[in-house]
Amino acid sequence: MELFYASLVCLFVLLLSLSFLFLFNKKNKSMILSCPLPPGNSGWPVIGETLEFLSTGWKGHPEKFIFDRISKYKSSIFKTHLLGEKAVVFCGASSNKFLFSNENKLVQTWWPSSVDKVFPSSTQTSSKEEAIKMRKMLPNFLKPEALQRYIRIMDHIAQKHFQSWENQQEVVVFPLAKRYTFWLACRLFVSVEDPNHVARLADPFDVLASGLISIPINLPGTPFNRAIKASNFIRKELVAIIKQRKIDLTEGKASDSQDILSHMLLTSDENGKFMHELDIADKILGLLIGGHDTASSACAFIVKYLAELPEIYDQVYKEQIEIAKSKGPGELLSWEDIKKMKYSWNVACEVLRLAPPLQGAFREALVDFTFNGFSIPKGWKIYWSANSTHINPEVFVDPLKFDPSRFEGNGPAPYTFVPFGGGPRMCPGKEYARLEILVFMHHLVKRFSWKKIIRDEKIVVNPMPIPANGLPIRLYPHHVKT
């Protein structure tokens, strides 16, 4: 009998708790829904404000879309309609902190539909789910001891790369920077080092990257259509590489730790299943895009700013030539050398602030929530903008001035410098990018000084900033008196 009464009491308490929880959630949701949506405009039917969002980048001023609306609505949060989706743009350090701190709680990563169509996974999962799996695989490849091993490989390839610059009076920087970073990615991800093989893959990757974030109209000649064709071509090439690697692993001609491709082939999931060839090709394709595109933009803009600012160039040269003098004949760069490149990295960071390869990124609201007094409905897309802090005079004094000293000591305030994102979604290849950029700077400045040929070359952002004419420069080798 006592057990019966005890059970009744427990049941009563449980029902009371559930009722209270229901009322609390209902009240909480009511409070959320009672808050207004952020101010803003949905633009034209169907396309919304997508064309204006993209066109400001094509004109070289992607921040204009952001700052014009901040000024118009007197709010750092505003609603819009982008890439076929209802969206809210979050601006400022507090917004960055909120989004990065609530990853997988209130928001999750989101890609436009064009990305899933350009990267048609061989599995029945979305690119979002595949990215989560990929991020679980990367730590072994990007752990400190692995990165330290890559420095020698990067140095070796950089030396071979800059041989193509020698005996040239003029070069066009951006395509050469892309060749350098793509060569590194091919070597370190899939052990493809032959220049002819790298070149065969490089051009389709350029087409793919330019059409990745585009209006998904699959008609002949559109950037989206060209991106799909390029993706299909690259996947076939990668499948051929994967098939050969399987043979090489079986015959002992390849090792299980030589690159991320071997790791993928030999690693099973929690159910003991191995990935299919097309699945691996999808993931390698994504890695090759992320592993070279952003760094090539950064390298090109480093060349641009060092040409415009000879006093900055002189300081970088001084640091790098001291490192070069400390090396014996044929001795490759080491981790200790990289740690000495402090001023060079401050310069690179200032370049990333003024010309961030990652202009921003999208999230999706997992639930209804409020922020800064505004209601954000479940399912709406959220875009955060790097430029909203990077060139904001309230965050960085005289924001358009090139000043590497901003990164001395503790550097910028948290959540204000976000070229690699932040929180759980921070780019896992940040340290990899740092190494390839610093190795590039080392070999560039110890060999050459240079001048821009087009003084006021236009910048185009699509989706990353690139010089409209590729940044042609005139080279002055250091061993030649000029």
From Swiss-Prot:
GO terms for MF: beta-amyrin 28-monooxygenase activity; heme binding; iron ion binding; monooxygenase activity; oxidoreductase activity, acting on paired donors, with incorporation or reduction of molecular oxygen, reduced flavin or flavoprotein as one donor, and incorporation of one atom of oxygen
Main location: membrane
Binding positions for heme per the UniProt entry: 427
Keywords: Heme, Iron, Membrane, Metal-binding, Monooxygenase, Oxidoreductase, Transmembrane, Transmembrane helix
Transmembrane segments: 4-24
Keyword rRNA-binding appears in the UniProt entry: no
Protein name: Beta-amyrin 28-monooxygenase
